[in-house]
Swiss-Prot record:
NCBIfam families: rRNA_mod_RlmN
Function in brief: Specifically methylates position 2 of adenine 2503 in 23S rRNA and position 2 of adenine 37 in tRNAs.
Catalysed reactions, as listed in the record: adenosine(2503) in 23S rRNA + 2 reduced [2Fe-2S]-[ferredoxin] + 2 S-adenosyl-L-methionine = 2-methyladenosine(2503) in 23S rRNA + 5'-deoxyadenosine + L-methionine + 2 oxidized [2Fe-2S]-[ferredoxin] + S-adenosyl-L-homocysteine; adenosine(37) in tRNA + 2 reduced [2Fe-2S]-[ferredoxin] + 2 S-adenosyl-L-methionine = 2-methyladenosine(37) in tRNA + 5'-deoxyadenosine + L-methionine + 2 oxidized [2Fe-2S]-[ferredoxin] + S-adenosyl-L-homocysteine
GO biological process, any: rRNA base methylation
Organism of origin: Bacillus cytotoxicus (strain DSM 22905 / CIP 110041 / 391-98 / NVH 391-98)
Keyword check for Protein biosynthesis: no
Organism superkingdom: Bacteria
Gene3D superfamilies recorded: 1.10.150.530, Aldolase class I (3.20.20.70)
Radical SAM core domain span: 111-344
Protein name: Probable dual-specificity RNA methyltransferase RlmN
Catalytic residues of the enzyme: 105, 349
HAMAP family recorded: RNA_methyltr_RlmN
Amino acid sequence: METTTRKQKKALETKKPSIYSLQLHEMQEWLKEQGEPKFRAGQIFDWLYKKRVKNYEDMTNLSKGLREKLSNSFDITTLNTLVKQTSSDGTIKFLFQLYDGYSIETVLMRHEYGNSICVTTQVGCRIGCTFCASTLGGLKRNLEAGEIVAQVVEVQRALDETNERVSSLVVMGIGEPFDNYDHLMSFLRIVNHEKGINIGARHMTVSTSGIIPKIYKFAEEDLQINFAISLHAPNTELRSKLMPINRAYKLPDLMEAIKYYINRTGRRVTFEYGLFGGENDQVEHAEELAQLLKGVKCHVNLIPVNYVPERDYVRTPREQIFLFEKTLKNRGVNVTIRREQGHDIDAACGQLRAKERKEETR
């Protein structure tokens, strides 16, 4: 439920910090303050991320006193699974309930090269993209780092049943990751750490709608993480129509920030381009996009959009998608069409949560 204001207030009053929010060095510092040896941090991380226990009593190589200190200081964040949808292609979409009653989505996608998870960083979104279900209802709050980490842990628990593992992740779920920058960075470092979830940096991707100051900041981070931009239009006028954020952060300035990122890191960026029938999917749009990206070290990911009942956009015909791709290739752009997954479930970002919220208000 997302209307239980009294319940949310009470939850905030009784909530302890999530232990999943602590990076290893922060855990070591806390242990030092408690008069405990710092090597215990590695043991605690092993229980949390390798054995994935749900309570401190199971941490049997820790003293009873330390377990009590942990229990008094931190919650082991658990997410209540409200809905679990499984697609015919193996994609699984989870609707998780948080401690305060809000709900978020997490998606498990199966590929030939392994299992990938798409995580959420906010409850709702303020960006207001006109094609996205995530922004319906606006932004409620940011997720803590531990709540983002908990999504990976919960999905990994589900995979434990079939002896599988999460091998890669994308930060492309509900919300704008760079609007929750500090918690995002803590999350990335926890899941990347060898004593944490241990997902390689080059197997992680962060996507942004284009918050320019944070792009410059992200360029200075010492992380080899893949970077993606939600572009969706080849010019300022059309992008402002599809994505209101473009009115604050103009496309020319965005491109300058992206070029800075590329020069600073030496890494290629991915441009996500959703195709909306009759809006941005014509040959002239492809030609304009090729011109915009000329000389930019990048890859374009064309996305056949999922239908969202609350939005007016329609899917681009299959033959038009291939023509758009061909036009870009002929002009030297590195481009692929994203494989559709979860097409027979509520796969569009924010769609399952929006559906649940609608049912609650009936």
